UniProtKB/Swiss-Prot annotation:
Residues 10-38 bind DNA. It comes from Aspergillus terreus (strain NIH 2624 / FGSC A1156). This is Isoflavipucine cluster transcription factor ATEG_00326. It is found in: Nucleus. GO terms for biological process: positive regulation of metabolic process. GO terms for molecular function: DNA binding; DNA-binding transcription factor activity, RNA polymerase II-specific; zinc ion binding. CDD domains: GAL4.
Length: 424
């Protein structure tokens, strides 16, 4: 019987189903890089026909003569059976080939140290190759061999070596699977802008709103100063719906800085969770005193606009006068689907009062949440500057609060007058 054929790939590359690249009298590239023992075991392949065209010039002379002398169709070609030769002549030549291969690889360990099942054998591993076919590998590709000794103590068995190498490869090249979560941290699609840019956009929106409020306030007619002064609505038409629109703009702008006063945020707060108070920090950098005064300026202009509207209504009721048809103010229509509310004066007055009360209540809650930025470094802000800024803002808040209370009282009085006159 011929000696068992030694597989071309080392045990480590064979167990991982990788191509074994080696040259001369040294270990393969992967074993040298991992500082592992590079050993060869006998092949357990049996009766698997190899259909590879090997050049005759690359095969030893004895094998080439055997291939040319074989004329029997039942006789297999050289390389078809590497572990179980079919004739005595083949035994002699394969032994010569085995001896020549063994002499050229003195660093190969004895066969059988790492037994591998035949099911893990690849068909390309037993193809006959010579040293001329193997690529030459430079020492820089495996510095462990050039600079230091190779590990000589092999693991206990081939399965342990396979597990160690598999763990090493998994750590170097992690792969995300269905059961293994991805190692990469998720990246948010939404990129938060810098706080400075956010605050600058808020101040710009407040400034534009302040200009629009100033222009809109100029279109609302002033109420009569006394009962003796006649009242007329001619050439004094203005849009009440724009007043509501500007009020909503102020609510939305300030809500971006203080979202805890959104109605949706209140609805989403779970039961049993204490609601955040005005002392909690806003969703961005706090507004400075100048920005807080800008918010109060917008709110003051809205209060003045509403006060003019309701003062004109109160003047009409106090005089018990009947407005001519051509002097009617164009009120916005209210429509729900195909249903439209009638355009009666009483109904329009009720809608205006209710919408104004609701918007003013929401704006009042938001204004109470606006707090200036408090300096954390006492060295940067002197005591006089801090006292002056705090006094200015406190006075502005008190003034705006007084104007708000006066407007709410006017709305309540107007509603009571409409009820007494049986208009509502």
């Amino acid at each position: 019987m011929a000696k068992p054929n030694q597989r071309h790939a080392c045990d480590r590359c064979h167990g991982q189903k990788l191509r074994c690249i080696h040259s001369g009298g040294g270990p393969c590239v992967r074993c040298a890089k991992a500082k592992a023992t590079c050993s060869w075991s006998q092949s357990l392949r049996s009766n698997r026909l190899k259909r590879h065209n090997v050049p005759i010039s690359d095969v030893p002379l004895a094998c080439a003569q055997l291939a040319t002398q074989s004329t029997d169709p039942n006789t297999p070609q050289f390389g078809a059976y590497m572990s179980q030769p079919s004739s005595a002549g083949v035994d002699i030549d394969i032994n010569l080939l085995q001896t020549q291969f063994t002499d050229s690889t003195p660093w190969a360990l004895p066969a059988g140290r790492y037994p591998s099942p035949a099911s893990q054998e690849m068909e390309t591993y037993n193809v006959g190759h010579t040293e001329a076919d193997l690529p030459t590998t430079a020492d820089w590709m495996w510095p462990a061999v050039a600079n230091g000794p190779v590990q000589t103590t092999p693991p206990a068995n081939w399965q342990q070596a396979f597990n160690q190498e598999w763990a090493m490869m998994a750590s170097q090249h992690p792969v995300a699977t269905m059961n293994t979560p991805s190692r990469t941290s998720p990246v948010s699609d939404a990129v938060d802008p810098p706080n400075t840019v956010c605050l600058l956009a808020t101040i710009r929106e407040l400034s534009e709103l302040n200009v629009d409020l100033y222009a809109h306030e100029a279109t609302v007619p002033r109420p009569p100063a006394s009962l003796d002064e006649p009242i007329s609505w001619k050439n004094k038409d203005f849009a009440i719906d724009r007043t509501f629109h500007l009020s909503q703009r102020l609510i939305e702008i300030v809500n971006k800085r203080y979202p805890r006063y959104l109605e949706t945020a209140r609805m989403q707060t779970p039961e049993g969770t204490p609601e955040r108070t005005s002392e909690s920090s806003p969703s961005g950098p706090p507004l400075d005193q100048g920005s807080c005064l800008l918010v109060l300026s917008c709110y003051t202009r809205l209060i003045e606009t509403y006060d003019r509207i309701f003062a004109n209504m109160q003047g009409c009721l106090d005089r018990s006068s009947v407005t001519a048809r051509e002097d009617y103010v164009n009120m916005p229509s209210v429509q729900v689907g195909s249903f439209s509310l009638p355009h009666s004066s009483s109904l329009q007055i009720v809608l205006i009062l209710q919408l104004a009360r609701q918007l003013l209540t929401r704006m009042g809650e938001i204004i109470k949440a606006v707090q200036p930025e408090k300096g954390t470094n006492s060295a940067d802000v002197t005591l006089s500057e801090s006292a002056t800024g705090g006094l200015l803002l406190s006075s502005a808040l008190e003034t705006v609060s007084a104007e708000e209370d006066r407007l709410m009282k006017r709305i309540t009085k107007l509603r009571s007058t409409l009820i007494e006159l049986n208009i509502l």
